[in-house]
C-alpha cells in the first residue's frame, strides 16, 4: 500500500503540471522498476522503490520536468542494481530514456574516498553528459537531494562524507543550473551533518526571532500593499528568510554575531504582468512606487532584469530603510522570472520554446565545460578544482570595442578575456587596452570595462600565465599548449641523444 500511495502521489503531481499527459508511459516505467527492485529494502527499512518514486517526484514537482525525466528517474537505479541492461531499457522505453539511464549509471558512486581520482573521473563523465542531455545532471541532483533528505539512516562517517561531497559539488552545480531552492536545501542539509551544533544554534535563533520578524514585515508591507493595489497590479508579496548556511557563512566571513546580520530577511514581490506592458518596465514601476515610500540605498541596486545572471536569474534588487530603521532588501520579479529563479534550467526550456533567442549564458557555460572536459588532461582531480573555481563565482560584464558583452567570473584578468573571445586570441595575446589604457595581461577586470586585446604572431603561452588566469577555459587551453611543447622538447632531446 505504501508503494501504491507513493506512486499515486507522483501521478497527482504530474497531472497538476503543464506537460502533455503520458500517464501510461509513467505507469509502465513504475511497474518495470517496482518489479526489478522487488523485495529489496533501503537502509531505513522501507522498500527500495520508494527512493526512485521520491526522486521522480522531485524531478516533476520541484524541477518541473516532463514524462521522459520522470520515467528516467523511476528507472535510474535499475541497470546498476539489478540484472537488467541498458539494452533492456532501450527495448522497453526507447533511445532517449535509455541514454539518460545509461548516463546516470555511469556516474554512480561518490567523488571522495579511496578511489578519489577514479571518482573524479566519474564526475567528469557526469558533466560531459550535460552537453548531450541536461536532464541527466538534473536527475542526478534530484537523486542527491533525496539521499540528503534521508541521510539520517546512514552511519555518521558516511553522513560526513556525503555531506562534504554535496557541499563541494552538488550545491554549486544546482546554483549554476539556477535551481535556487534546491541549492539552498542541499547547503542547509550538508551543514546540518557537518556542523550540527552551529546548525542547531542558528535554527534556534531563527525560531526565537520569528514573531518579531513577522511583525516587522507586516509593518513594512502595509504602505507598499496600498500603493501597488492602487496601481491595479496583480502580485504577491512575501518575506524570505536567509538560509541557516548562508547566515553562518556571513557570521564567519564578517566575524559578526547573529544579531548583527541586518539582511536576515528579504521581501519578494512577484507580479503577473499587465497585458501589453513590458515586464522590465513593470519592475521599474514597482521600484518607483517603493522608493516613493522608503529611502533607498543607491549602492545596493542590482539590475538583473536588463542583464540576467549566467544561470538565467532575472530580478531587480534594491535595499531600502524600513519603518523601524533597519535596511530591507526587496526582490522584484515577474511570475516568469520567479519560475526561472526557482526551477532554473528546466523553466528555461519551457519559456525558450516561445521566445526564440540566441544561446543563454548557461548554454555558453555548458559549452565551456565541454571544451575543458574534452581536453586530454589526465589529472581529473585538478580538473575538479578548476570546475569548482568557475561554479560559484559571481559574474562581471565586460565589453568588446564593438560593444558586445562577455560574461566572466569575478577576478578575471585581461588574459581570461582574450581566451573568452577565442583560444587562438588568448594564445597570441601580448597585452590589452582597458578603457583605452594599456595594461598587462594580468590586469584584473571590473564590470563595465571596455577591453581591446593586443596580439602578436610570435607570442606563445607562457608557464607564468597559469599564476594569474582565473577561468577554467584559459587554464585548460594554456595547460594543453604547454604540455604539447614539453612533449616536443622531450622528443627532440631524445633524437639528439640517438
Predicted segments, located by residue:
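Short, contiguous pre-domain boundary segments
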Residues: 1-19
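Short, mixed-charge amphipathic alpha-helical segments
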Residues: 13-29, 85-97
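Active-site flanking loop/helix segments enriched in acidic
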Residues: 17, 29-58, 108-126, 402
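Alpha-helical phosphate/pyrophosphate-handling elements in metalloenzyme active cores
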Residues: 28, 40-74, 78-88
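Generic hydrophobic/packing signal
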Residues: 59, 63, 77-82, 93, ...
Amino acid at each position: 500500500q505504501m508503494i501504491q500511495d507513493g506512486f499515486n502521489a507522483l501521478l497527482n503531481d504530474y497531472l497538476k503540471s503543464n506537460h502533455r499527459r503520458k500517464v501510461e508511459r509513467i505507469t509502465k516505467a513504475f511497474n518495470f522498476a517496482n518489479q526489478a527492485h522487488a523485495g529489496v529494502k533501503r537502509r531505513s527499512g522501507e522498500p527500495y522503490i520508494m527512493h526512485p518514486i521520491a526522486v521522480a517526484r522531485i524531478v516533476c514537482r520541484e524541477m518541473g520536468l516532463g514524462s521522459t525525466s520522470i520515467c528516467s528517474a523511476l528507472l535510474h537505479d535499475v541497470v546498476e542494481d539489478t540484472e537488467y541492461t541498458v539494452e533492456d531499457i532501450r527495448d522497453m522505453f526507447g533511445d532517449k530514456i535509455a541514454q539518460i539511464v545509461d548516463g546516470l549509471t555511469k556516474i554512480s558512486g561518490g567523488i571522495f574516498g579511496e578511489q578519489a581520482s577514479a571518482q573524479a573521473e566519474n564526475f567528469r563523465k557526469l558533466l560531459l553528459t550535460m552537453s548531450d542531455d541536461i536532464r541527466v545532471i538534473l536527475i542526478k541532483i534530484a537523486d542527491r537531494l533525496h539521499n540528503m533528505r534521508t541521510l539520517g539512516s546512514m552511519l555518521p562517517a558516511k553522513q560526513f562524507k556525503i555531506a562534504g561531497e554535496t557541499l563541494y559539488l552538488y550545491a554549486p552545480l544546482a546554483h549554476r543550473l539556477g535551481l535556487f531552492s534546491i541549492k539552498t536545501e542541499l547547503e542547509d542539509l550538508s551543514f546540518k551533518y557537518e556542523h550540527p551544533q552551529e546548525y542547531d544554534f542558528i535554527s534556534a535563533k531563527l525560531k526565537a526571532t520569528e514573531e518579531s520578524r513577522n511583525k516587522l514585515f507586516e509593518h513594512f508591507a502595509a504602505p507598499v500593499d496600498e500603493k501597488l493595489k492602487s496601481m491595479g497590479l496583480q502580485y504577491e508579496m512575501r518575506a524570505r528568510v536567509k538560509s541557516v548556511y548562508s547566515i553562518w557563512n556571513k557570521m564567519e566571513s564578517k566575524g559578526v554575531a547573529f544579531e548583527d546580520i541586518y539582511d536576515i530577511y528579504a521581501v519578494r514581490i512577484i507580479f503577473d504582468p499587465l497585458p501589453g506592458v513590458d515586464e522590465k518596465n513593470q519592475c521599474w514601476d514597482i521600484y518607483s512606487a517603493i522608493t516613493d515610500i522608503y529611502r533607498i540605498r543607491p549602492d545596493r541596486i542590482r539590475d538583473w532584469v536588463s542583464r540576467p545572471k549566467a544561470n538565467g536569474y532575472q530580478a531587480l534588487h534594491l535595499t531600502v530603510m524600513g519603518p523601524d530603521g533597519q535596511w530591507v532588501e526587496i526582490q522584484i520579479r515577474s511570475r516568469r522570472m520567479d519560475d526561472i529563479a526557482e526551477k532554473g534550467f528546466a523553466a528555461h526550456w519551457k519559456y525558450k520554446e516561445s521566445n526564440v533567442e540566441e544561446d543563454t549564458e548557461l548554454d555558453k557555460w555548458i559549452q565551456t565545460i565541454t571544451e575543458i572536459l574534452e581536453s586530454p588532461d589526465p589529472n581529473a582531480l585538478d580538473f575538479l578544482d578548476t570546475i569548482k573555481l568557475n561554479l560559484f563565482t559571481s559574474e562581471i560584464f565586460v565589453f568588446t570595442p564593438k560593444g558586445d558583452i562577455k560574461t566572466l567570473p569575478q577576478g578575471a584578468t585581461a588574459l581570461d578575456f582574450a581566451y573568452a573571445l577565442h583560444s587562438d586570441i588568448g594564445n597570441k595575446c601580448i597585452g590589452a587596452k582597458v578603457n583605452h589604457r594599456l595594461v598587462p595581461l594580468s590586469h584584473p577586470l571590473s564590470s563595465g570595462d571596455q577591453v581591446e586585446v593586443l596580439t602578436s604572431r610570435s607570442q606563445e603561452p607562457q608557464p607564468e600565465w597559469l599564476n594569474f588566469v582565473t577561468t577554467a577555459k584559459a587554464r585548460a587551453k594554456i595547460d594543453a599548449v604547454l604540455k604539447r611543447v614539453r612533449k616536443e622538447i622531450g622528443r627532440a632531446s631524445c633524437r639528439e641523444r640517438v
